[in-house]
Design a protein with these regions (language model features):
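A short acidic, helix-capping loop that chelates divalent metal ions and anchors anionic groups
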Residues: 22-27, 85-92, 284
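Short, well-ordered coil/turn segments that N-cap beta-strands
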Residues: 11-16, 46-48, 72-76, 115-119, ...
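Conserved, mostly hydrophobic/aromatic
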Residues: 6, 18, 35, 50, ...
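N-terminal binding-site loop/beta-alpha segment at the start of enzyme catalytic domains
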Residues: 1-77, 327
Length: 328
């Protein structure tokens, strides 16, 4: 497994990470046993950058990850997030970036993960009611006392990133980036590169759409949250599916999978970008790991660009309510 440094932070992570969200929620049924086996296999393969959050499964995902790494903590870089608040029944209750909440959330995450220190601690969504300087100030105190090693932001605007960086070094920005979500190329990527901040790309497989695994909406279970996403809607599904055909063709010519092409494309966008595809199954993890062996020629990249120009996907990447919480 290759390594990459997150910006100029000094934090070295595997070039490919593992998003753990779907092991607890959102993407249909999951098995804890299989999920833990997937995490263990990831570590064995050198995929040691693990990503979770306190809101995934209302804390259950952190507990799952903590259990999986209990006897191999020194082999992983552990990232979690705070700030997206949920009630005891899983209801979404907005965001909270107040200093008191920051510190309380960290304590709860440390307990659930059963660790003494979190390697990378992100603010999951920016709280528009609290100046980012106050939130990051509280986060920096967690670094001072040794509960957190590095700080990160998620789905923050360029202006917010700049303000945050003046308070404490930001190691990473985590934001969606893939062939069908390229908004960050306008302002976000140039900003983090200017400031020496690493970029962690979540949903690099377009929430699974770019894998070529879906042919109709019926392929999504009734409990799958993607049914509520505009790009998976009846209105947009067919046109988005047509975009994936070029990826299929390139993959077939190289004797690899569409997933591997999609991940290789993200990896090719810069050594400072680390994609964290999520999966709860060993076979998909292994498939994703092999994307690092895929080399895209200039011709391949040109074909991909022609098929997936900026803004090619139909529909917004989140439902309206969730879109309101990004890039602020």
């Amino acid at each position: 497994m290759q390594d990459r440094e997150l910006g100029n932070s000094g934090l070295i992570v595997s070039a490919l990470g593992l998003g753990c969200m779907g092991m607890s929620e959102f993407y249909g049924e999951a098995s804890d046993t299989e999920s833990i086996a997937t995490i263990h296999r990831a570590i064995d393969l050198g995929v040691t950058f693990l990503d979770t959050a306190d809101m995934y499964g209302v804390g259950a995902n952190e507990e799952l990850v903590g259990s999986a790494i209990a006897d191999r903590r020194d082999r992983v870089v552990l990232a979690t997030k705070f700030g997206s608040v949920r009630g005891p029944q899983g209801e979404f209750m907005g965001v909270d970036g107040t200093p008191a909440y920051v510190k309380a959330a960290c304590e709860r995450s440390l307990v659930r993960l059963d660790v003494e220190t979190i390697d990378l601690y992100y603010q999951h969504r920016v709280d528009p009611k609290v100046p980012i300087e106050e939130t990051v100030g509280a986060m920096s105190e967690l670094v001072t006392v040794g509960k957190v090693r590095y700080l990160g932001l998620s789905e923050a605007s360029a202006a917010t990133i700049r303000k945050a960086s003046e308070i404490h070094p930001i190691a990473a920005l985590q934001t969606e980036y893939s062939l069908w979500t390229r908004d960050v190329e306008d302002e976000i990527l140039p900003t983090v590169r200017e400031l020496g901040i690493g970029f962690v790309a979540y949903s690099p497989l377009g929430r699974g759409f770019l894998t070529g695994a879906f042919s109709t909406r019926a392929d999504l279970s009734e409990t799958d949250a993607r049914r509520n996403h505009p790009r998976f809607s009846d209105e947009h599904f067919a046109s988005n599916l047509a975009l994936v055909e070029t990826v299929r063709e390139i993959a077939k010519a190289k004797n690899v999978t569409p997933s591997q092409i999609a991940l290789a494309w993200v990896l090719s966008r810069g050594e400072d970008i680390v994609p964290i595809p999520g999966t709860k199954r060993v076979r998909y993890l292994e498939e994703n790991a092999h994307s690092l062996e895929v080399s895209l020629s200039e011709d391949d990249l040109a074909k991909i660009e022609a098929a997936f120009p900026y803004g090619a996907a139909a529909g917004t990447r989140y439902p309206e309510a969730s879109m309101a919480a990004v890039n602020r």
